[in-house]
Amino acid sequence: MERPTEEKDGKRAYAAEDCEETGYGICLTGKVIVACPDVFPGNCGNQLYFCTGGSGAEPDSVEHTVSGVSLKNGEVTRFRRSQILGTLKPQLLPEQAKLQLSQIRPIGALPLEGHEPLYSGYSFLEDGRYAARVWLCSEKEAMDYVEMQKPYQHKVMLCDRDDFCVMKVVAGKMVFPDEEILRKLQGQADGGSMELT
């Protein structure tokens, strides 16, 4: 029997049964990972990280390093691969960690200094709460933001620079634009890149 999400947030250590995937044969990059409870003894509330890469994030990398952003305080941390239990089941991510995750820009995002944002990304909890917008400098960054948030957030929304919604995903499914609009856009793209606006 799975424990309720709120109980897991800092009161009891996450274990292998809380993971969707475990072992060395999986890629960790772009997923919420669970650090072993003994990495930070007495602080089981700091086990969840968004994996940003590292040579240890690749499959079958036993003692190489894994980089991650804490979903408790936003600090960047490095681990040995052997210190990672696995990837968290998305439904077990606590609300506060979802809000922290929503503020992380996609892996490989351009620095905001010297690059003008074209889109903003928002991720919402089921009750409508959100932390703040995340600036995104390209269509690729915008789509990467949606893909990294989609498994964990209730609603993900992309807006253009004028803050008009150009894409909305609810419960992992795109609801705007609908499939008919997408087919029309793909027909107009003529093999080139589609614009979200």
Regions flagged by a language model, labelled:
Residues 125-128, 133-160:
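A short, charged, amphipathic alpha-helix used as a generic interaction element across diverse proteins
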Residues 32, 42-59:
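Short beta-strand-centered aromatic/proline hotspots
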Residues 44-51, 102-107, 137-146:
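Charged, amphipathic alpha-helical segments
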Residues 187-197:
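Non-Sec secretion/translocation targeting segments of pathogen effectors
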Residues 65-104, 173, 178-179:
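Intrinsically disordered, low-complexity, charged/polar segments
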Residues 106-131:
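Short aromatic-glycine-(Arg/Gly/Cys) micro-motifs in beta-strand/loop hairpins
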Residues 1-36, 97-105:
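Mixed-charge, Lys/Arg-rich low-complexity intrinsically disordered regions
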Residues 73, 82, 122, 128-130, ...:
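Residue-level signal for glycine
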